[in-house]
Amino acid sequence: MIFLVKRAGWWIADYAYAVYWQFRAAFDRQDAHAFASGDAAPLLILPGVYETWRFMQPLITALHDRGHPIHVLDALERNQRPVHDAAQVVEEFLEANRMTDVILVAHSKGGLAGKLAMAGSSGDRIRAMLAVATPFGGSRYARLLPVRSLWAFSPSGPSIVELAKLLEVNERIVSVYAAFDPHIPEGSELVGARKNVRIETGGHFRILADPRVLAEVAVLSEG
């Protein structure tokens, strides 16, 4: 009973976080160029489905304060396009800006697009990826949802199946996830990952604010 109450509390806190920052993101007019300066490793932000980069602004601000130049992809908009298309946007951005040694910082679906980009023609431009709450193995809830665009996250979805075969890039990925994710009951552990970081909390969104995320980016930046 106590366990169920704890999960319910996590669920409520998670959606409160999501609603608050989605609302803030809808009205925020911060210029992305304000985060482009810095001498640390360059970071490229990949938000989740129905999220713009502004949803991740608390994390972006914290990373920029630590010296990282931050790059965002306005072309992704709310990241509703197929994973393959999102990965192509990532590759085109890296090529157009001649970026190298980039670390991807991704949330949820953004991690799927990031992994596909790492395996693509521009993969050598990417040093590593920190993926937060990414459904690498899919989610059995996907097919139960009334939105067709979310069915792609089913464990049997073509993109999920394809990504599972791309084992060679896993060693460059750090997967950070909560002990309880209401969206991904299977969890986000990635076989062969550079590191799997399981945080003893619950949530799919508010885990973006966990200090371990910043700590793991720092480790990737140093190595």
Where does each model-flagged region fall?
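Serine-dependent carboxylesterase/thioesterase catalytic core
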Residues: 43-54, 58, 62-172, 176, ...
